[in-house]
Amino acid sequence: MGLAIVLASIAVRGQAASQSPGLQIIPQPKQLNALPEVFRFRRDNRILLANPGSDDDRFAAQDFIDDLKASAGVAVVISKGRLHRGILVGRIDLPQIREVLRQAGLEVPTTLNTEGYVLIVGADQVIVAGKTEAGTFYGLQTLKQLVRGEGADAFIPAVKIVDWPTMRWRAVSDDISRGPVPTVDYIKRQIRTEAFFKMNMHSFYMEHTFASESNPLIGPTGGSLTPAEIRELVAYARRYHVELVPEQQTFGHLHKALRLEKYADLAETPDGDVLSPQQPGSYKLIADWYQELNELFPGQFFHIGADETFELGEGQSKAEAQAKGVGAIYFEHLNRVREVLKPYNRRLMFWGDIALHHPDLIGNVPKDMIVMNWQYGAADDYSSYLKPFKDAGLDQFVCPGAHNWNQIFPNLEAATKNIVNFVRDGQRAGAIGMMNTTWDDDGEALFESAWYPIVLGASASWQEGAVDIQEFDRDFDWSFFRSDGNEFVKAERALGSVPSLLNAGTTDELFWREPFGNQFINETRNLAERTHHMRRIVEDVAESVAKNENRARRNHSAVAAMLFAAQRYDHLGRRMEVVQKFSDEYWNAYLNLGDRVKVRKLRYYTGAIYNNLREMAEELSILKENYRRQWLAENRPYWLDSVLARYDQAIAMWLAKSRQIDEALRKYELSSTLPGPEEFGLGTRPSVPIPNR
């Protein structure tokens, strides 16, 4: 069949359409029409570049070839000459591409913006044509997801796609200042994976982790991005059409710099984290940092941070704040930073939280600055947060969150609602971009666990309107893991539901909470049924992941991250059950000291073979080693020991508690008495009768 047959009319134009059965693409294309025929790979498969001199197109084609070989076992080469059968790649305005599209009767819609592309698959030819080289690259990312089968059975279903992004900028912000600092290789993985889902911006959140040559004391050795690394990453990202944006804080969150005696005078309050606008040296520090960053990051933007300046007006600027208000000082600082950075001709981004607290002063923000409007609540409607900046004529990004911070695994119930609704409302308000944020507040978050919300943000910002979560989940396993079915997304969603199930704001905090105390033990009693249910859920996840892990042809490391999260959750549940049972049985023994049978049941917490307390330490030892491997797979060794120390402390605590109960039982054999339960931190007396066990 000829190519023209592929170009059947499209029922839905200019808006996101539900995908045809069997086609699983994230983000969903704007216009899509599928036909029953297929393009089958043969030994002589070739890719022809319409512009052989385009380094960008050659790179994009080779990237497609490498992925095809790795994921489907198919070999294709780039060749010259006329194309009779194979894949033609190039810009829409090139003569060869124009002629093919003319013969096919395809008119490129006026809505096709600079990152848009046309993808046509027929029985003999595949055409990937972008408005620019970026569009061609994105067309090839879609083509990767269309390839089905493996080896000699690999094929591409016949399809016509016309696609373009709804939002100009589709970004990820990665916190590299609260503990984990990714390796260069892992940042490259982030760039590749984000670009695969058509994201075009990656921002480094930095408080003290830029290895500044002008201020070398601030950046920790082994835990900072060096100039050489940045140059390498900028060049790498450019090939994937990803702009790297430095976010070097310029106001709050600077404690790790200000704690140094050299910079202590710049702090708004002693040992604080806000840079004082009263000190000229504050602006000298900012100027030094950004003079270096300007040489390293050649893009359009600087992100100056400036969120959560809680101490402003409480120290050096107190008198001025009393005279004219904290808000006025804040906006004056923004303008001063803008003047310092003006020679670099960048658009400055800043977090919008403080501005929202002073809506009457938003008009003081220069119109060339961009508001990074972060909101992390899971709301139905975000329009009230968007309206003040829209009314002021300011460009803004919507900045939802992956909800990975302080969690064993991201809270996907909160993240899904936050991302889908905030991006939808941002589009309605004319936001120019979306920046999905990951945070490492407690220093132990693993980025590899956060891909589901990251990919959801990519989909929400490319597509128009609200993402249909059922369709997104239907497509996720294929698009992300290149795996048929839905076993992995079910595991993601199950793990992501645990914070709500346990009614736990932060599951990391619950995991590390002191287990021997009234609060924890009473809470475990109240959550007993939920804990049992949670353990069944996460054990089902672990079993499913173990059975299916070899089916993941892409992003296999994310499977390991899910399995580790399931194991941590299971240990948390078991710990809650062990502590509750230990408390109940100790109280039962303490209230029945004359019943030696009941007392001797406490041997299950001291024995050489069966020892529930020692088992907790053993499980933690295994988790500790697993965590170490997970960490080093994506991060530098820097900061790892501070997290592993938490495991060591917990292991020592369980072993000490076992020795303590063993000593108590030895004394019981001599005196028929036991220490009071409060000495073991075993909570208050149970309010319901303790069952005989």
Predicted regions and their residues:
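Feature activates predominantly on carbohydrate-active enzymes
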Residues: 67, 105-342, 349, 398-400, ...
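Short, internal active-site loops enriched in acidic
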Residues: 92-94, 250-251, 308-311, 354-357
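A generic structural motif
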Residues: 52-53, 178, 377
